[in-house]
């Protein structure tokens, strides 16, 4: 038995399922999860000392790579001045100014401690601002574990086969309407059936919690037009895509201006950070300037702000986002070429520093329904073979993968060499 397996058995005695976030339990791929002891650059090292090329990146935040010197030094420096004050600091201002500069639609920014807090707060704000109770989300999209958002959700909820969670009262869930991602007709139908009742649409601009699904041409433009016509707010949940798709986030990449934006992951540089922001007239509805209440003991934590500020400063240096996108493209197209070589039909999607691959003979993957038709069992086999070859992919067919600036030609070459061997084995087993 490996040390990771021993730790997992021990963890299950005191931690529900042995993990503090469900997808980490490897329920979507089988077997026992690896327990991580340390990480550096593009590599993670498990409790048994084995190294893996990491394409999970702590589920997105580690865009510079693990243990980056600039972030590490910023954290140490901030920690030496105090861990938490529960009072305003200049670092919060610096961080808000930088975020607003990079994402112009975020005229004002409120810091929180997680992506879930960001989306939960943005939806409360949208309801308070519009005076409407209903919200619209998309099937397979995940926006954190707030009650109103765990309806036909993606991510770990989808991995475990429970996209709509028990514990969410039906009377509460009725205020959440679910449309089909990449299908504007489904959006129009819901607005027509709920005239004047919908406060907002919340959407992942690139769906990353049913693997990786970019928008089809005209989808986001259509959402913007519909929201304007119906008096609803458009919320971009950029917790995953923020600063990973492009320097000015997915909204800059697709040239769409949402009313509100939610951020997380990358803006913390590995620390627990979230944020939401948008038009000043809307943000002024948040307490203490407005009636919509939102608060948090650790919001704007000085150590977390220092980490996030350092991360964004390095990430936005000239050429870095382009290099990240190039690396991702090489990896994704390499997977597809090798899968085809071994007679294994595959679709790959990629944008910026995120990617997804699907074992399927479908031409494209654009909706949740398309994803559910893919060969999940083949994905499980590929995941476990790659893990044995020292490559750590997302342990779920419904999660996007991530590259970092620390991934270079050496890591991509090693990953594709491993994939070649794994595809060959799967092809041989399929005969």
UniProtKB/Swiss-Prot annotation:
Q: Where are the transmembrane segments?
A: none
Q: Identify the GO cellular component terms for this protein.
A: cytoplasm
Q: Which PROSITE patterns match?
A: AA_TRANSFER_CLASS_3 (PS00600)
Per the record's keyword annotation, is Isomerase included, yes or no?
yes
EC number(s) reported in the record: 5.4.3.8
The kind of enzyme this is, by top-level EC class, is isomerase
One Gene Ontology term of the molecular function aspect? glutamate-1-semialdehyde 2,1-aminomutase activity
InterPro entries per the record? Answer: 4pyrrol_synth_GluAld_NH2Trfase, Aminotrans_3, Aminotrans_3_PPA_site, PyrdxlP-dep_Trfase, PyrdxlP-dep_Trfase_major, PyrdxlP-dep_Trfase_small
Example GO biological process? protoporphyrinogen IX biosynthetic process
Q: Which UniProt keywords apply?
A: Cytoplasm, Isomerase, Porphyrin biosynthesis, Pyridoxal phosphate
Cofactor dependence is on: pyridoxal 5'-phosphate
Give the chief site where it resides.
cytoplasm
Q: Does the record's keyword annotation contain RNA-binding?
A: no
The record, for CDD domains, names: OAT_like
N6-(pyridoxal phosphate)lysine, modified sites: 265
N-terminal signal peptide: none
Question: What pathway or pathways are given for this protein in its record?
Answer: Porphyrin-containing compound metabolism; protoporphyrin-IX biosynthesis; 5-aminolevulinate from L-glutamyl-tRNA(Glu): step 2/2
Q: How does it assemble?
A: Homodimer.
Q: Which family does it belong to?
A: Belongs to the class-III pyridoxal-phosphate-dependent aminotransferase family. HemL subfamily.
Q: What is this protein called?
A: Glutamate-1-semialdehyde 2,1-aminomutase
The uppermost taxa in this organism's lineage are: Bacteria, Pseudomonadati, Pseudomonadota, Gammaproteobacteria, Vibrionales
